[in-house]
Amino acid sequence: MPTYIMLSTLVGDGSQTMHSHPDRLLEVDKEVQAVGCKVVTQYALLGMYDFLTVLEAPDNETVAHLSVDLASRGTVKILTLPAIPVDSFVSKLKSHEQLGRGPVDAD
């Protein structure tokens, strides 16, 4: 399945909910799984985002629906990004012409 990065910021009552009910984060992970996605790993962050979640989802539509669903609760703001493994990215660059300059020379 494709990999996605979700950057989450608690808003509204989100911080209070996490403070009084820390296991809520694990409950959300179960909800993510229920829609066909898989949480690969999660980190609590310092800075402009509170959490980074790496997840796998069947397709863009599924992860977009998940993102909107979670954000609609009013406790979190989410930025979702598709992630491409670097090996796949490099392979794709080597296999196609680049902006009209012809194929990349193999070293």
Segments (PLM) and residue ranges:
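Short S/T/G/P-rich N-terminal loop/turn motif that feeds into the first structured element of a domain
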Residues: 1-34, 38, 83-84, 88-107
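Short, well-ordered beta-strand segments in beta-rich or mixed alpha/beta enzyme
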Residues: 5-9, 43-66
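Intrinsic disorder/low-complexity signal
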Residues: 30, 49, 55, 68, ...
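A generic structural signal for short beta-strands and their flanking turns/coil linkers
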Residues: 35, 47-51, 74-76
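A short linear hydrophobic-aromatic micro-motif
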Residues: 36-43, 78-79
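An amphipathic, aromatic/His-enriched active-site/gating alpha helix that lines ligand/cofactor pockets
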Residues: 57-87
